[in-house]
Amino acid sequence: MQKHWWHKATVYQIYPKSFMDTNGDGIGDLKGITSKLDYLQKLGVMAIWLSPVYDSPMDDNGYDIANYEAITDIFGNMADMDNLLTQAKMRGIKIIMDLVVNHTSDEHAWFIEAREHPDSSERDYYIWCDQPNDLESIFGGSAWQYDDKSDQYYLHFFSKKQPDLNWENANLRQKIYDMMNFWIDKGIGGFRMDVIDMIGKIPAQHIVSNGPKLHAYLKEMNAASFGQHDLLTVGETWGATPEIAKQYSNPVNHELSMVFQFEHIGLQHKPEAPKWDYVKELNVPALKTIFNKWQTELELGQGWNSLFWNNHDLPRVLSIWGNTGKYREKSAKALAILLHLMRGTPYIYQGEEIGMTNYPFKDLNELDDIESLNYAKEAFTNGKSMETIMDSIRMIGRDNARTPMQWDASQNAGFSTADKTWLPVNPNYKDINVQAALKNSNSIFYTYQQLIQLRKENDWLVDADFELLPTADKVFAYLRKVREERYLIVVNVSDQEEVLEIDVDKQETLISNTNESAALANHKLQPWDAFCIKIN
């Protein structure tokens, strides 16, 4: 298998609105990100995935783009973006842009032209019909919006301000590739592709994702843009299986570097139920089965996976699956060790490395997220109590991940000097912040730093086979094996003591949040014990 820089990299996701504010308006900005590059260099990450900073009316926090080649005012300007790229490069950090090409904003010049002039070439950049079918928007309600100017309906799988693009149109596709090359020429390190599995949709046949032309489009995109460069490309593919992931990420197919698959995230809610019907208790045996499947069926050389617990759309993993009380630090380290020592490229979401948690939202006034607000409205209309609705939002709503980054114990956690930040700062910021983490040599931060360094220095993390070991339900243990080397990873994913029924001869400890020698000797794992050892 040809090795690429991203096989040994760890990527850090930044949600710009919430990372660092330098102009006191309560909203993060590009200068704020640049000001924190030394911190990210200390952590050791090789790339930043930057959530959208393009010109946008911010209906969906930047995932509604009005101009792909301009920066939205609240984040700064193109000079700030160029400076971020330059300063990041000086520190050995690449910038991965968020590519949102399933849809644009309804304020994009293409859509304005399409609406004003039904006979224009831009009209065919979007999807129109006379009689809508029953397709539904992911944000609730119909996926079709009536446009009185032309007496037709346009398709929007997200908000009505996010009309879907028509990838059947070759001129549109070329314009997208030209835009990608604009950013590649600026020196970016790659693209994270938002809901990329939806670009091959056929609405008339109710085909939303994994449409028949999807992979042809990606091959064309690869050849026309990033294929000539050593860039990281990752597709957001909610419905992917290992077989589908191979189509995207097998190097011989010339599509993407890797995928984000979400099968493990599905354990956050009841099977076949909407995400709001959350399950607080992690089904560890099911998690083992899912990770085992992805580690063994997406074979080395035939595809590549991403490893993540958190992103801007998901609740904080500590709040849903970890422990936010007595074992907060220990469970955060355990979940990190469990994930980062598998095969794949790990992604850290801002604040994960210091153990940030969900926000205790009291009412809808504290929310910004369009998805949560739409859910609340729909659920309340359908007879759910506001208490039940808020309970779901507190556990699973997208704003949990989007509260401001907690830098120190000063006003607004050091994020902003504004009287009011765009989302409230989590009240636990005086205890959970970067400054405190850096001062404590035993903090979660240094476990992440160690895991990132291990990946850079050890080929076995890329090459070694994966073998899930039979253990008690709440114990997740696996071997990584390559040539004569054996590495044992053990994690107690629970608040209880567990029995470890493995006899091994330890050679050395690579990383631990516990006294692993004691655990191996008496076969007892304390709550949230986690370690990786080299064995004979």
Curated annotation (Swiss-Prot):
It comes from the Bacteria. Keywords: Cytoplasm, Glycosidase, Hydrolase. GO terms for molecular function: alpha-amylase activity; glucan 1,6-alpha-glucosidase activity. Gene3D superfamilies: Glycosidases, Golgi alpha-mannosidase II, Oligo-1,6-glucosidase, Domain 2. InterPro entries: Glyco_hydro_13_cat_dom, Glyco_hydro_b, Glycoside_hydrolase_SF, O16G_dom_2. The record marks 313 as: Transition state stabilizer. Transmembrane segments: none annotated. The keyword Cytoplasm applies. It catalyses: Hydrolysis of (1->6)-alpha-D-glucosidic linkages in (1->6)-alpha-D-glucans and derived oligosaccharides. The keyword Cytoplasm applies. GO terms for cellular component: cytoplasm. Its EC number is 3.2.1.70. Pfam families: Alpha-amylase (PF00128). The active site is at residues 194, 236. One of its GO terms (biological process) is oligosaccharide catabolic process. It is found in: Cytoplasm. The physiological substrates may be short isomaltosaccharides. Belongs to the glycosyl hydrolase 13 family. This is Glucan 1,6-alpha-glucosidase.
